[in-house]
Design a protein with these regions (language model features):
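Histidine-dependent nucleotide/RNA phosphoesterase domain, centered on the 2H-phosphoesterase fold
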Residues: 1-177
Length: 177
């Protein structure tokens, strides 16, 4: 199974993202994410068997125990890659705690022996892939600065359900002791 550690989003945040994505979809063609798939990835892991999932759970619990619940807030739209083949995303307001949480998860997974991709953590929620954008028009799509409390981290499985990509929660680890 393909797995990643992330933060699930509440309904208000999903609503705000869906509203922005719906407006973007009218302007920019692409493969848009399903509303229920919106999340913030802390660390992509990749293929994992049952034994690996046990190690991941231990790493998640250790990382989560170090942090009290905290808030995240939506920022504006932006993109990765080239405008003709972009990943459209909504950023999050910079949060040192969020960055530290992602780093803690990563360090514990590396210590447990996982091979992880290199790269700097960039907090975001993917709205579309293979989007054809006009970068100047992105600013015309407002994003309500919705926020939410982060109280847990989640291990998600990326799988197909009725031929649709879904991110299914496998386990949750509450923040704090």
């Amino acid at each position: 199974m393909r797995v990643f550690v992330g933060i699930g989003l509440d309904e208000k945040m999903r609503d705000s993202l869906w509203e922005a994505a719906s407006k973007a979809q009218k302007l920019f063609p692409g493969r848009y994410s399903a509303r229920e798939n919106y999340h913030c990835t802390l660390q992509f892991i990749g293929q994992a068997d049952a034994a690996a999932v046990q190690l991941i759970e231990k790493a998640m619990k250790e990382a989560a125990a170090q942090f009290d619940p905290f808030s995240i807030t939506l920022a504006g739209l932006s993109f990765f890659r080239r405008p003709q083949d972009a990943v459209l995303f909504c950023g999050l307001v910079k949060s040192l705690i969020l960055e530290q949480l992602a780093q803690s998860v990563r360090e514990r997974l590396l210590t447990a022996g996982f091979k992880l991709e290199d790269g700097e953590f960039h907090s975001h929620i993917t709205l579309a892939r293979q989007a054809r954008l006009d970068p100047k028009s992105l600013s015309l799509i407002p994003v309500a600065p919705e926020g939410q409390q982060v109280k847990e981290i989640t291990l998600f499985e990326s799988c197909r359900v009725e031929e649709q990509l879904r991110y299914v929660p496998l386990m949750r680890c509450p923040l704090g002791k």
